[in-house]
Amino acid sequence: KIVREMLEAHLVQELEIKEAGSRGRPAVGLVVETEAWHYLSIRISRGEIFLALRDLSSKLVVEDCLDMPLVSETPLLDRVITQVDQFFIRHQQKLERLTSIAITLPGIIDTENGIVHRMPFYEDVKEMPLGEALENHTGVPVYIQHDISAWTMAEALFGASRGARD
């Protein structure tokens, strides 16, 4: 019953397993459905914001690199939310089911609570509740990580240092 529910929710797909010389009904395996589920990754850096829609296998669906002026009359939090909204409008034809938003940026960050205490280059950032504001705005979970920590973790999991002890 649970497999049927997962199939109906498009979480998994059935995959027929062919074994040479086997008899009877062929075995049916399950694979995770990754293409219909997306997450938005955001990287904020000096003067730029990168927004990338990816499926759950991390395959890139669409990406934008946009200017993010260091000084503006509009607070950075409002500008990020505006950029996310405009990204979704521009690429609504490619957007499937959005599961979450992942953000990397430099600065002093409370990753548990999604608060950016300070951020280099953007002087208006002081105790910015980026995670909470974006989660309330979009309705999906938001995860924030320091950019260097995220890059280090990605290198350890998927890069040349994969499987290394130190």
Placement of each model-derived feature along the sequence:
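Residue-level recognition of short loop/turn positions
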Residues: 9, 57, 112-113
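A short, conserved structural fragment
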Residues: 9-17
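Short, hydrophobic-biased segments on the C-terminal half of alpha helices
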Residues: 2-4
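Conserved phosphate-binding catalytic cores of ATP/NTP-utilizing and phosphoryl-transfer enzymes
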Residues: 17-39, 146-166
